[in-house]
UniProtKB/Swiss-Prot annotation:
Name of the protein in question: Facilitated trehalose transporter Tret1
Gene symbol of the encoding locus: Tret1
Record's GO cellular component terms: plasma membrane
Organism annotation: Drosophila grimshawi (Hawaiian fruit fly)
Topology of this chain in the membrane: Multi-pass membrane protein
Topological region Extracellular: 484-512, 563-569, 618-624, 730-745, 794-804, 861-873
């Protein structure tokens, strides 16, 4: 029967159930005359055909349908997932004596005729008895129906961030009280309920029903936008009621299957998805994305995900005057959204997960497990990404943070003991397992919104350190040669200008050019090194400098005149310029981020070893023998360079994917999974190729590339204008002018030793303290010592007695070298290989290196002239003022690159926006809309 037929039968045959099957219409003939006429014709036809029993069966079905009410006639379609109504009893279950009737009707007509009258009388008697029994047990049957078909109950509604249970209906309480009294008495003699509505009661017409439906619709519309869940009230078993045991056995089994954990969780996700998109805005996001209007998409998405009444964000986004303000507003909203989606406010997971069939007995007895389920706020806290505090706006950090937040919220909906969220907090105790744990990437916030704890990224691959150390050691031997070449002039010029030790005459001007030509040649080498590392590769370019180094030192050692010495110094300076450019680039592209700072400082440390070696050897050797020693140093450097591979990034830039994979396997270890890193390199290279132009100079002048290039140039400028090379080149002369009682060569050895020790201290601290902290310490140390040195030379120039503080210059030099070697010595070269974008890394590094050697040449060449012009005190004070300016440059311009991948650094430096595909996938939880 349809819903309309049910209503007709319920109105027309209301008294038929109590009065028997004779007159189905009763007193309602004036309301349902067509039904009465049809029933009369049907009775006439069946009686004439000898099938009066069939008429009784039809009339009984109509009587049974009086109490059958479909859910569709009460509540129309609604997007909320209502539970299904209890299954209706089949008429044959109410009339068991009619179940065999179809077989009897299939018998031949001639066999049925002799028994027909007897069967009619027997069935008529049974039917009359059944109707009388049905009338007596009608109140009990109605109560059973109420108990079986439990009324729908609304889940708790959100009101001012609190959860309140709606009050129970008075009628429902009365029914529960009556049921309790019946069960307590255990008697079947029950007081009959009032009969069904009769014709004296006004019939509810279509208009009245439509009014009720409209009220229901309005009430449901008011519920939209809130997190509402519909479920049945808890089932109450009645073991004393034997009349319903057989009918409820199958229903209870089905209910246990339907109430399984997975079904509850899926239903919970569907309800959550429906409640989140309460304004229906997500359906037009595809059209918005097609028009590439990112701000409009963000505004729409935020409003659609806003469930706590913060529509003011849309106006904030419209009023954003700049991109930075827009990002700030969006980050603030993310925090609000994550807090609004926090289970401690919007979910009551204990009710959703109550009665889960997958929970074991062991879990049920676990007090901690129960506490976590019944108090979701103890399971998780909202996790937001404070990109400003972390100094990172990279796509990778954002996605990683979002995935971590989604994972935590997903686990909070899962009551299974094996993946409880509170066990994830033990990650903080495993920080010692790997250096990677020292990289903070998200912060948990407390209820007041202030950062309190740090969460650490779990390790994915073990750091296979030995191959990376071998690679760093191989290229660092080249830096040893560079340091030896830089310090050569300080001890060599003393013996070279001695006519007794030299077969040719060296004037003061020639000596000035011997010391100053190498920085000038380094400028040329830095310019040429950029294209070389792009076309030949990083490793091949470094390898190509070994043989010219040997030739340059042989030219100096075998020189018979000044031009041969200058030629050898120029060739050595050219190789120094190329090596100083390519060494940090190679290490930056081969070493993992966790140890890039430590291994990245090895070239600087070996360079200082070369300086110290040159100072010590210069004490016992003349300039010619010292040059032969310098020619022997590139030999082990040449041998070790054949053992290491090219950088994977350069292979990817040339389309050699298989060679890049082999290089990564060699660097990371055979057991390491290199595919994610390789895919990241290929994706980064693809992005660089899309944005690259054929004109290299135009690439350098792009706004997105100017920022990292300017930072690199600024670091190089303040490194050289701090006066370090002037101090190194003229250490002996400075100590003579200061009137020190120590031998000049001894002072030089002391300075070199301090430089070497300070560099290794920096190696230990750079991946723990960070780049900027070391730059701050370095600046402060240099500023103090330069001003003190200036004061010392000022007092000496004005005739004051400084003999009592004769060791002051040495102490100041030691502190100055210590501060420089901690920060401004190695970090500018290290950060040059980190912050420059991949597509311009070669050309930009060439410009930065050339600029560095230009500053070196200017400072070295003009230092003696500067002393003559403004005095030694004026020169040191000038360097101190420049270091003060450098401090502000570091504070406001230099980013922190500690623990970040090159891709993360590049995205932040270039200010690259997030891809629309990744933005579109940002949802509160990973469910299907």
């Amino acid at each position: 029967m349809s819903g309309r037929d049910n209503r007709a039968a319920g109105a027309g045959g209301g008294s038929g159930g109590g009065g028997g099957g004779g007159g189905g219409g009763g007193n309602h003939h004036h309301h349902h005359q067509p039904l009465s006429n049809a029933m009369g014709k049907l009775k006439e036809k069946l009686t004439r055909a000898g099938e009066e029993l069939g008429y009784h069966r039809v009339e009984s079905n109509l009587s049974a349908s009086n109490t059958a009410t479909s859910l569709d006639t009460i509540l129309p379609e609604d997007p909320f997932p209502f539970p299904q109504a209890a299954p209706q009893r089949h008429p044959q279950q109410q009339f068991p004596f009619l179940q065999q009737q179809p077989q009897q009707q299939q018998q031949p007509q001639q066999q049925q005729q002799p028994q027909q009258q007897q069967q009619l009388q027997q069935h008529h008697t049974q039917h009359t008895q059944y109707q009388q029994q049905q009338q007596q047990q009608q109140p009990l049957r109605l109560l059973h129906d109420i108990d079986d078909e439990q009324p729908l109950s609304f889940r708790p509604l959100l009101e001012d961030d609190d959860i309140h249970e709606p009050p129970q209906e008075i009628q429902q309480q009365q029914l529960q009280q009556q049921r309790g009294n019946l069960r307590a008495s255990g008697s079947l003699e029950l007081t009959p309920l009032p009969p069904p509505p009769t014709s004296l009661e006004p019939h509810r017409d279509r208009q009245q029903r439509s009014v009720v439906n409209e009220e229901l619709q309005r009430s449901k519309q008011s519920l939209k936008g809130s997190r509402v869940s519909f479920e049945r009230a808890p089932q109450q078993s009645n073991s004393n009621n034997n009349s319903k045991n057989n009918s409820k056995t199958t229903v209870a089994a089905d209910a246990s299957d339907d109430d399984s954990f997975e079904d509850r969780r899926v239903g919970y996700q569907q309800q959550k998805a429906t409640s989140v998109d309460h304004k229906g805005i997500l359906k037009d996001l595809r059209h918005i994305l097609a028009s590439d209007n990112r701000r409009q998409f963000q505004a729409k998405k935020h409003v659609s995900l806003d469930i706590k009444g913060t529509p003011f964000l849309q106006d904030l986004l419209k009023d954003s005057s700049s991109e930075e303000e827009f990002h700030k507003t969006r980050r603030e909203f993310q925090g609000r959204k994550h807090q609004s989606l926090d289970p401690r406010v919007t979910f009551k997971l204990d009710k959703v997960l109550h009665g889960s069939s997958t929970d074991s007995d062991e879990e049920g007895e676990d007090a901690e497990h129960k506490r976590l389920i019944h108090r979701p706020k103890d399971i998780t806290k909202p996790v937001i990404i404070d990109l400003k505090d972390l100094e990172s706006e990279s796509d990778e950090d954002f996605l990683s943070s979002r995935q971590n937040f989604q994972q935590q919220r997903s686990i909070s909906t899962d009551s299974r003991k094996s993946r409880r969220l509170y066990e994830m907090d033990e990650m903080g105790n495993k920080r010692g397992e790997n250096i990677r744990h020292a990289v903070p990437f998200v912060r948990q916030i407390t209820e007041d919104g202030k950062p309190k704890l740090e969460v650490y990224r779990p390790t994915t691959n073990p750091i296979y350190i030995w191959t990376q150390v071998l690679a760093a050691l191989s290229v660092s031997l080249g830096s040893l040669v560079v340091g030896f070449s830089s310090a050569y002039t300080s001890p060599a010029l003393v013996s070279m200008t001695d006519r007794n030790l030299t077969s040719f005459d060296v004037s003061t001007e020639d000596a000035s050019w011997v010391g100053g030509i190498m920085p000038l040649a380094g400028l040329a080498g830095g310019i040429a090194g950029g294209p070389l590392i792009e076309y030949l590769g990083r490793r091949n370019t470094i390898l190509a400098t070994a043989v010219p180094f040997i030739i340059s030192w042989l030219l100096i050692a075998c020189a018979v005149n000044v031009p041969m010495v200058l030629s050898g110094r120029f060739l050595a300076g050219f190789c120094v310029g190329i090596a100083s450019l390519s060494l940090p680039v190679y290490l930056g592209e081969t070493v993992q981020p966790e140890v890039r700072g430590t291994l990245g400082l090895l070239p600087t440390a070996f360079g200082n070893i070369g300086i110290l070696l040159c100072f010590i050897a210069g004490t016992y050797m003349d300039w010619s023998m010292l040059a032969f020693l310098g020619g022997a140093l590139p030999v082990p450097f040449l041998i070790l360079m054949f053992l290491i591979p090219e950088t994977p990034r350069w292979y990817v830039s040339r389309g050699r994917e298989e060679r890049a994979r082999k290089a990564l396997v060699w660097l990371r270890g055979v057991e390491a999974d290199v595919e994610p890193e390789l895919k990241g390199l290929m994706r980064s290279q693809a992005d660089a190729d899309r944005q690259a132009t054929h004109n290299t100079m135009l690439e350098l002048l792009k706004r997105s590339n100017l920022k990292p290039l300017s930072i690199s140039l600024g670091l190089m400028f303040f490194q050289q204008l701090s006066g370090i090379n002037a101090v190194i080149f003229y250490t002996v002369q400075i100590f003579k002018d200061a009137g020190s009682t120590l031998d000049g060569n001894v002072c030089t050895i002391i300075v070199g030793t301090v430089n070497f020790i300070a560099t290794f201290i920096g190696i230990l601290l750079i991946d723990r303290a960070g780049r900027k902290i070391l730059l701050y310490v370095s600046n402060i140390a240099m500023i103090l010592t330069l001003f003190v040195l200036g004061g010392f030379f000022y007092c000496k120039a004005n005739g004051m007695d400084v003999s009592n503080v004769g060791l002051l210059p040495l102490c100041c030099f030691v502190v100055y070298i210590l501060g420089f070697s901690l920060g401004f010595g190695p970090i500018p070269w290290l950060m040059m290989g980190e912050i420059l974008p991949a597509k311009i890394r070669g050309s930009a590094a060439s410009v930065a290196t050339a600029f560095n050697w230009t500053c070196t040449f200017v400072v070295t060449k003009s230092f003696l002239d500067m002393i003559k012009l403004i005095g030694a005190h004026g020169a040191f004070w000038l360097f101190g003022v420049i270091c003060c300016i450098g401090m502000f440059f570091v504070i406001f311009c230099v980013p922190e690159t500690q623990g970040k991948t090159l891709e993360d650094i590049e995205r932040k430096m270039m200010g690259r926006v997030r891809r629309m595909s990744s933005v579109a996938n940002i949802k509160p939880l990973s469910f299907n809309m």
